[in-house]
From Swiss-Prot:
Name of this chain's protein: Acetylornithine aminotransferase, mitochondrial
Localization annotation: Mitochondrion
Taxonomy of the source species: Eukaryota, Viridiplantae, Streptophyta, Embryophyta, Tracheophyta
Pathway where this protein functions: Amino-acid biosynthesis; L-arginine biosynthesis; N(2)-acetyl-L-ornithine from L-glutamate: step 4/4
Family matches, as HAMAP family: ArgD_aminotrans_3 (MF_01107)
Entry's family note: Belongs to the class-III pyridoxal-phosphate-dependent aminotransferase family.
Native source organism of the sequence: Alnus glutinosa (European alder)
Sorted UniProt keywords: Amino-acid biosynthesis, Aminotransferase, Arginine biosynthesis, Mitochondrion, Pyridoxal phosphate, Transferase, Transit peptide
Residues recorded with modification N6-(pyridoxal phosphate)lysine: 302
PANTHER family in the record: ACETYLORNITHINE AMINOTRANSFERASE, MITOCHONDRIAL, AMINOTRANSFERASE CLASS III
């Protein structure tokens, strides 16, 4: 039975009692001029999405302010709702689906592995896990890998590794380094440790007290960071080479170099969070390669398995030597299925010419956006590297994002809500980028209507 059949049963699946959902904002979107909007094919089919959304309102916890769209299938850079309406996907599941949807090589690898072995615990060895670790080590600064299930879990592991490292390397100190440095506009996750490293106060405040000992500094402020690292007992500095959720801000080489030097001088670990910006998105395999500055620990997740849940913590031998049996663990992480999927993603990204094509398409797209949108009074800046692009506005980005949605284009917001974030599948074509730029241009008047 398909999901569409399930939600089309004549007999109600759930009680018919109406449940009001307070606090959930229902977005109102309107079509943009000169952009064709496909109409739902029938009243009957319209009901499928309606039934799904109504059922979700009854049974799901209201943690997401969802847009009123149900996505039921995808191919390449296109997504479709149950009514058959097509969307050009420049969100990629928030920088996850780097190979697009239903990539044939990825699908074959996952199907074959699922028919062979899906899950074993980490009490045992499995071939795909070891092979993936070997590939990650061979293509990075790292010597060893710890697998997790998500980006926030990867950062939680990095927190624990940093504290254990400080105790291991300085056993005679009565009070080893336990504090952390993070930066403005940072996002490192939503579990209690990684949440403590996330700068946005409204993410943290409902759950206070979170992990103590975190100091937030201005992103890019070399003097403040250097002084604090030298003065305090800092276990690790967490930094995103390119901030995605924070608004698509790129670090400077001088800033990352200064962090590296200050950490080396003080015995502090440097952690690069590349959960969103890593694995080819910038046109480099790792975002920090742009700057020629290397960390002690790097956390990965979103794109690694091409849509399946995975995270990874890459560490040097120096860090790994501090970690022993029982220091950390997880039931599901590094399973054969997700690791086989990740091997396929890595294989395709590392093919000759793939990363160069990402860089080329990213440059082409950014220049096109500057030319098409730069003259609009609401557009402050178009920035980014490769295929992580931000369009900063002087007003809320929501009206533009919503109008694009209604016109068949999926993009995201970021920063303080005034940045349009674009993180498409890395396989996107120049023609698809041109179409996206044209829709963005045609939808700009939505900013005036809601200004």
């Amino acid at each position: 039975m398909t999901s569409l059949q399930y939600f089309s049963l004549n007999r109600p699946v759930f009680p018919a009692t109406h449940l009001h959902r307070p606090g959930i904002r229902h977005l109102q979107v309107s079509a943009c001029a000169n952009v064709e909007v496909q109409a739902p094919s029938s009243v009957k089919k319209q009901g499928v999405s309606k039934e799904v959304m109504e059922a979700a309102g009854r049974v799901l916890v209201g943690t997401y302010a969802r847009v009123p769209v149900v996505l039921s299938r995808g191919k390449g850079c296109k997504l479709y709702d149950p009514e058959g309406r097509e969307y050009l996907d420049l969100s990629a599941g928030i920088a996850v689906n780097v190979l697009g949807h239903a990539d044939s090589d990825w699908l074959r690898a996952v199907t074959e592995q699922a028919a062979t072995l899906t899950h074993v615990s980490n009490v045992f060895y499995s071939i795909p896990q070891v092979e993936l670790a070997k590939r990650l080590v061979a293509s990075s600064f790292a010597d060893r890998v710890f697998f997790s299930n998500s980006g926030t879990e990867a950062n939680e592991a990095a927190i624990k590794f940093a504290r254990k490292f400080q105790r291991f390397t300085r056993p005679d100190e009565k009070q080893p380094a336990t504090e952390f440095v993070s930066f403005s506009n940072s996002f490192h996750g939503r579990t209690m440790g990684s949440l403590a490293l996330t700068s946005k106060e409204n993410y943290r405040s409902p759950f206070e007290p979170v992990m103590p000992g975190v100091t937030f500094l201005e992103y890019g402020n070399i003097e403040a960071a250097t002084q604090l690292i030298q003065r305090r007992k800092i276990a690790a500095v967490f930094v995103e080479p390119i901030q995605g959720e924070g608004g698509v801000y790129s670090a400077t080489k001088e800033f990352l170099y200064a962090l590296r030097k200050a950490c080396d001088d003080s015995g502090t670990l440097l952690v690069f969070d590349e959960v969103q910006c890593g694995l080819g998105r910038t046109g480099y395999l790792w975002a920090h390669e742009i700057y020629d500055v290397f960390p002690d620990i790097m956390t990965l997740a979103k794109p690694l398995a091409g849509g399946l849940p995975i995270g990874a913590v890459l560490v040097t031998e120096r860090v790994a030597s501090a970690i022993t049996y029982g220091d950390h663990g997880t039931t599901f992480a590094g399973g054969p299925l997700v690791c086989k999927a990740a091997l396929t993603v890595l294989d395709k990204i590392l093919r000759p010419g793939f990363l160069a094509s990402v860089s080329k398409k990213g440059h082409y797209f950014k220049e096109m956006l500057i030319n098409k949108l730069g003259g609009n009074s609401h557009v402050r800046e178009v920035r980014g590297v490769g295929l992580i692009v931000g369009i900063e506005l002087d007003v809320s980005a929501s009206p533009l994002v919503n109008a694009c949605l209604n016109s068949g284009l999926l993009v995201l917001t970021a920063g303080k809500g005034n940045v349009v974030r674009i993180v498409p599948p890395l396989i996107i074509t120049e023609q698809e980028l041109e179409k996206a730029a044209e829709i963005l241009l045609q939808c700009l008047p939505a900013l005036d209507r809601h200004g």
